[in-house]
Amino acid sequence: MRINPTNSGFGVSTIGEKNLGRIAQLIGPVLDVVFPLGKMPNNYNALVVKGRDTVDQQINVTCEVQQLLGNNRVRALAMSATDGLTRGMEVIDTGAALSVPVGGATLGRIFNVLGEPVDNLGPVDTRTTSPIHRSAPAFIQLDTKLSIFETGIKVVDLLAPYRRGGKIGLFGGAGVGKTVLIMELINNIAKAHGGVSVFGGVGERTREGNDLYMEMKESGVINEKNIAESKVALVYGQMNEPPGARMRVGLTALTMAEYFRDVNEQDVLLFIDNIFRFVQAGSEVSALLGRMPSAVGYQPTLSTEMGSLQERITSTKEGSITSIQAVYVPADDLTDPAPATTFAHLDATTVLSRGLAAKGIYPAVDPLDSTSTMLQPRIVGEEHYETAQRVKQTLQRYKELQDIIAILGLDELSEEDRLTVARARKIERFLSQPFFVAEVFTGSPGKYVGLTETIRGFQLILSGELDGLPEQAFYLVGNIDEATAKAMNLEKESNLKK
């Protein structure tokens, strides 16, 4: 991994002699800059415009070279608002790509696309920085062994297991528990894998970014008293940012994650919320640069841009980056080029269901809609695969019977179907579990359930050994032993009432 030891502040690396150009044209966030003969900057070089506007306010805008136009002219894209810029202003070529701070100094802090802290907690150590543009790891560096990334969340580990170094799509509307699930995963990777997380907020609402930060502080994922003990670094490029910032903020977050993987040799979780906004920003940039649009108005380079981001997210012999990406599906059209291109890269999907959330079953992961390419006997083993398939079959049969139950009632079902329904309801409740990060809201301590414990629990329910226990005993518990203990307590309570 290439690291630049610099003391130059954020966004850029210093070079000895300044290469100066001047703004020739300015259209929104796009600048045309003229440089002296033979001093043209390279593609993706960072340019800095410094000066004062008409009301004597300080201007400091960083841009990225996108096109070399000829006649000593380059076209660059601004990473922040271009208010106050005028033709003829001086532009400095930094001689290098955008570079951002990396390492332990980033934990517990919020950054913008340039790696500048935006949380009013003072400066960040910038002695170790890294450029945001890198090629994906060489094939020889990759760890090709297929292994499961245990999350400690029963429904995920059993029915839609995550691949170590894989990409997972997270689908769900507002208010079904996406944020809590994300925070629990951040908490669990830190405790069980000694890993860290990087959260990339790409083109979403500023309010949501602020809410996430506040919730992370409340749940202890970000340690206010000792920032260095925090488990996550946050990088935000929100809806109000120019398209250049929204297009590059994903790369900034990924660069920070790569350092933890390659240098610290850790397992890293990289969250991208929302991957659709990355594509959307690329589409805006493409139009601004005058490229011919492709299908549905998207950029012609859609697959290339997506690939250059996704191929860097992988397992190497040093460590792994496992990525969880929230996917917005425009107009619920799964054939739209943006989600369709994203699906090609995903190893698993976690679908959150409003119906389950309404029943109070959290995490509200839909066990039938969520999928994973890892759920194969040769990868997870026969026992895990068989248990998962039987759980799905039981839940599917229950789903088919629900219309009959609603119209005719349970009594009209056959004995076998009644047993299936009873077991399915136990399974449904056993798929819920108390989260560590939700302790402050629920009052019940969080539970991390290992994969072997999860499989054992569901096998006992399916075998019929626990048919005599009430279904509420399975609700919001950790392993199956807690469910049996809860059933005994419920029985004692009911006997006392009598």
UniProtKB/Swiss-Prot annotation:
The entry lists its GO molecular-function terms as: ATP binding; ATP hydrolysis activity; proton-transporting ATP synthase activity, rotational mechanism
Has UniProt tagged this entry with the keyword Transport?
A: yes
Q: Where in the cell is it found?
A: Plastid, Chloroplast thylakoid membrane
GO BP: any one term? proton motive force-driven mitochondrial ATP synthesis
User: Which residues does ATP bind?
Assistant: 172-179
Cite the EC number.
Answer: 7.1.2.2
The protein's UniProt keywords, in alphabetical order, are: ATP synthesis, ATP-binding, CF(1), Chloroplast, Hydrogen ion transport, Ion transport, Membrane, Nucleotide-binding, Plastid, Thylakoid, Translocase, Transport
This protein's record includes keyword Membrane: yes
Q: Which Gene3D superfamilies does the UniProt record give?
A: 2.40.10.170, Bovine Mitochondrial F1-atpase, Atp Synthase Beta Chain, Chain D, domain 3, P-loop containing nucleotide triphosphate hydrolases
- Membrane topology listed for this record: Peripheral membrane protein
Q: Check the record and name the PROSITE patterns matching this protein.
A: ATPASE_ALPHA_BETA
One Pfam family, please name it: ATP-synt_ab
**What would be one Gene Ontology cellular-component term for the protein?**
mitochondrion
* Coiled-coil zones: none
List the catalysed reactions.
ATP + H2O + 4 H(+)(in) = ADP + phosphate + 5 H(+)(out)
Supply the InterPro entries for this chain. Answer: AAA+_ATPase, ATP-synt_VA_C, ATP_synth_F1_bsu, ATPase_a/bsu_AS, ATPase_alpha/beta_chains, ATPase_F1/V1/A1_a/bsu_N, ATPase_F1/V1/A1_a/bsu_N_sf, ATPase_F1/V1/A1_a/bsu_nucl-bd
Alphabetical list of CDD domains matching this protein: ATP-synt_F1_beta_C, ATP-synt_F1_beta_N, F1-ATPase_beta_CD
Q: Which family does it belong to?
A: Belongs to the ATPase alpha/beta chains family.
> What does the function comment of this entry state?
Produces ATP from ADP in the presence of a proton gradient across the membrane. The catalytic sites are hosted primarily by the beta subunits.
Note the subunit structure: F-type ATPases have 2 components, CF(1) - the catalytic core - and CF(0) - the membrane proton channel. CF(1) has five subunits: alpha(3), beta(3), gamma(1), delta(1), epsilon(1). CF(0) has four main subunits: a(1), b(1), b'(1) and c(9-12).
Its name, as the record gives it, is: ATP synthase subunit beta, chloroplastic
What is the source species? Whiteheadia bifolia (Elephants ears)
